Amino acid sequence: MLILGVMNLRNELINETELRKALSIVQNGLFEIRALKKNPKRTLSGYFRDVDTAVNALMSDKIDLRGFNVYMSLNEITPECYDRSQKDRMIIPEVTTNDDVITSYKWLFVDLDPVRPTDLSTTDAQLGKAKSMAKRILAYLKGIGFEDPVVAMSGNGIHLLYRIALVNNSDNEALIQKCLQALSLMFSDDDVKVDTA
C-alpha cells in the first residue's frame, strides 16, 4: 500500500492538490484508503472509485485524522469490495482488503527505509541516503528494461512504483517476493534497507 502520510488534512500537513495528484497517478479503478493509529489503536477504511469522492471523504469535518498513518491500496481488488459498509466514506470497518480480494498486481512497490530506532523520524541525512539508493536502483532497473517508476517520498523513506500487470496467483506472488529479495541483496546496506515484506 502506498503511504499518503501522517496527517490531519484540515491542518494542511498534506496539500489537497498534492493528495489529488498522488491518488490520480496510482488509483486503478476501485481502491481502498486505510488510516491506522497506534495510540489508541484505531483503524478507519473506505472504498472509492474516484479521486474526488476519496478526497472529499478524507477532508470531511466528520473525521479527525490527527496522528493517523494514511495509505491506499495499489493492487486491483474485486468489485464486490465496493459493496462493503465503508463504500465512499471513512469509517471503522468490519473487514478490509486482504490477499483474497486482490485480483491482480498493478505495481511493483519498492520501499526504501532508512535504518533507525522504532518511532523516530528519518533525519535529512538518512533521507538523503535513501534517495541515493533509489537513484541506484532506478538506474539498475532501467538498464534491464524497466520503465521509469513513480517516485514518492513516504513519511520516512522513498517509494519506487513500477507498473506491472500480473494476475494474483502464488507464482506471481513468489516472483514479486524474489524480485524484492534480489534488490535487497544487491542494494540494502547498514543505512537503508529494501523492504522485502
Regions found by a protein language model. Name each.
Residues 192-197:
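C-terminal polymerase-core module
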Residues 2-156, 163-188:
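Signature for HUH/AEP ssDNA processing cores
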